[in-house]
């Protein structure tokens, strides 16, 4: 695994002490994340735990997606996953309801990451 000197995206945002990222920086980071997820999906790999803790900053703010521990390879025969895995703040409604889910759940998580990049907080907060 490549060493990412910038650490994870969550820590990077925390180190900024609640200072918002510029719009250009948000897009620069987010587009790279989307390209990485697109690549995974093109190989039929669903990450299933996309979050700022699993996105890393390499040299020159280049993005790397890590922690593939719960990733799943989907196929035409098995086009859905059913195990409830991931981090609650980033889970799609299908996963929360323990329904079958597919790549669209990663897209939901991407939306949560984008919200966090823009607002420096999770889109949904609850005690349980």
Stretches with model-predicted labels:
Residues 10-20:
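AlphaC helix of the protein kinase catalytic domain
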Residues 106:
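Conserved catalytic-loop aspartate of Hanks-type protein kinases
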Residues 119-122:
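Structural helix C-cap motif within protein kinase domains
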Residues 29-30:
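Activation segment signature within eukaryotic-like protein kinase domains
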Residues 2-8:
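Conserved short submotifs of the Hanks-type protein kinase catalytic core
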Residues 35-45:
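Protein kinase catalytic-loop region centered on the HRD/HxD motif
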């Amino acid at each position: 695994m490549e060493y990412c000197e910038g650490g994870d995206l969550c820590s990077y945002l925390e180190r900024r002490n609640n200072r918002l990222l510029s719009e250009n920086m948000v897009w620069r980071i987010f587009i790279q994340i989307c390209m990485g997820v697109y690549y995974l999906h093109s190989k039929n790999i669903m990450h299933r735990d996309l979050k700022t803790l699993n996105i890393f900053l390499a040299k020159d703010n280049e993005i790397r997606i890590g922690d593939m521990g719960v990733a799943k390879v989907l196929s035409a025969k098995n086009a859905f996953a059913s195990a409830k895995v991931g981090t609650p703040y980033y889970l799609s409604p299908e996963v929360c309801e323990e329904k079958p889910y597919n790549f669209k759940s990663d897209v939901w998580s991407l939306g949560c990451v984008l919200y966090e990049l823009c607002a420096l907080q999770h889109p949904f907060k609850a005690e349980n």
